[in-house]
């Protein structure tokens, strides 16, 4: 009787697989969803999924890659935490608010993904992307999804090639000798003479609905190999600085090329200064400016980026103070009215610039529109949440304490990265 029941279940699975094949062969469009699991109760690093990595919330890196890949009919973040939900929506994702039953420490990824599938019956293919994969690029997702949509696989997962010699674990203090698991110690191969082993790197797992209903992997499965530079593990605090350096070099920074930035607009109050205005006994107004920040401005100017300091009607600067700042920084200082966005657009029109050519540094609610529209944007560490959510980069430094220098270095790093890529593309074109 048990055998008959097993055959019946197998028959059901075969029917599902044949149905998926019919859809593929007929060219019928299947709904493909990206799903990032981001529970609030991370044990290794508290709220790790929205901790800022290289100026971007961790889940922002994979959400940017998923959205820009243009492969998904919907992009989702599954969470049980209000702050993660806010960040997810800011980065263009829909939110699956998971139930308490799948939000426990003991809950598995499969439990959550199956709940998501039940609540979204229109979804045919789920691409489960790990939030801890900040070096993921759109082309990785596109190529892996084609293995499902064009090659007929029902389960695809990412791997990386490792060249690690593994040994059997034995009890400490015991007399049992360890044994090699994947090598002959008498004939140790050189790295270049050994193909290594394929290991899951956890970047993503893609499954058809039929597959996910019976497990995370199954059916006709395949691996998608990623290069080591794109494979990053973030589990404990010590991984964070390593991942930050890796993502600055190999991360995906978006569709717009950062080298086109021609102009930086930077707020004086709350960015270049700490927001305080000191008044002398004679009534003279003074502000404190960090020399690191003024050096950052000069670094940009030397690279051909114009820097204009701006002040809103709510933070008026005296003419003497504005002149002093202009002289010290070598920048024009402009006083803007209440319509900051409108005046910035007029300024861009005068200079024949587009938003992607503008970097904007703000610090509060009036700056949100410009922070959203600018090709690059940033806020100091101590900016309010409304501004942080709108900015593309969140500084580690506070206002008046190096935030402008940090953002300047970020702009220059992206320009250098883009210039290097352009040079590499030129070499490839000339060679081939």
Swiss-Prot record:
Keywords: Nucleotidyltransferase, Nucleus, Transferase
Catalytic-site annotation from UniProt: 188
GO molecular function, one term: N-acylneuraminate cytidylyltransferase activity
SUPFAM superfamilies: HAD-like (SSF56784), Nucleotide-diphospho-sugar transferases (SSF53448)
Pathway involvement of the protein, from the record: Amino-sugar metabolism; N-acetylneuraminate metabolism
One Gene Ontology biological process: N-acetylneuraminate metabolic process
A single GO cellular-component term on record: nucleus
Reaction catalyzed: an N-acylneuraminate + CTP = a CMP-N-acyl-beta-neuraminate + diphosphate
Cellular compartment(s): Nucleus
EC number, UniProt record: 2.7.7.43
UniProt enzyme class: transferase
CDD domains from the UniProt entry: CMP-NeuAc_Synthase, HAD_KDO-like
Protein's job: Catalyzes the activation of N-acetylneuraminic acid (NeuNAc) to cytidine 5'-monophosphate N-acetylneuraminic acid (CMP-NeuNAc), a substrate required for the addition of sialic acid.
Subunit composition and interactions: Homotetramer; the active enzyme is formed by a dimer of dimers.
Protein name according to UniProt: N-acylneuraminate cytidylyltransferase
